[in-house]
């Protein structure tokens, strides 16, 4: 729940087109968790998850109108590139991220995948390793209904908050 709270705190930065630097991110995380990373309450990989969750919230709020305004998925890419460019690069890893092999789908690849899949409202989209929901939100914007799965406990909990209408399963998708 604290990661989600941090994402909500970061969303206005994205809405204003303001960069989320390390100090802004640290402030949001400390406010949401009530403690610093030095205390062990959170790590930087969790902070990056909060940034991705803020992107999901941004896309849910503005994604459809941005796509309409852009006219095509290809024309949407530069707009989304500007949003993603406001976020810090993910330079730090955690033991959990290595153990679960957590690698986020870049939004440009997500747009390509959703476009290639030609998702319609009649499609049910399975996201077997949904992470923070970056690919799932694009499928949702395209009109597909979602089936979400995430093994990692923190990310599964975050998905439940980001996609409250969708159940989140916790199977090992690698098996």
Q: Predicted segment positions?
A:
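Class I S-adenosyl-L-methionine-dependent methyltransferase catalytic core
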Residues: 1-175
């Amino acid at each position: 729940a604290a990661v989600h709270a941090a994402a909500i705190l970061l969303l206005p930065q994205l809405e204003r087109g303001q960069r989320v630097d390390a100090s802004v991110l640290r402030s949001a995380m400390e406010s949401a968790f009530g403690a610093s990373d030095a205390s062990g309450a959170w790590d930087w990989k969790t902070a990056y998850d909060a940034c991705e969750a803020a992107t999901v919230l941004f896309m849910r709020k503005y994604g459809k109108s941005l796509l309409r305004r852009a006219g095509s998925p290809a024309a949407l890419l530069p707009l989304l590139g500007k949003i993603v460019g406001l976020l810090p690069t993910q330079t730090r890893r955690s033991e959990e991220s290595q153990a679960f092999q957590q690698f986020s789908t870049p939004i440009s690849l997500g747009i390509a995948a959703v476009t290639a899949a030609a998702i319609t409202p009649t499609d049910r989209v399975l996201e077997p390793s949904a992470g923070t929901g970056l690919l799932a939100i694009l499928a949702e914007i395209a009109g597909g209904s979602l089936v979400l799965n995430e093994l990692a406990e923190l990310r599964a909990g975050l998905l439940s908050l980001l996609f409250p209408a969708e159940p989140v399963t916790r199977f090992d998708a690698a098996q």
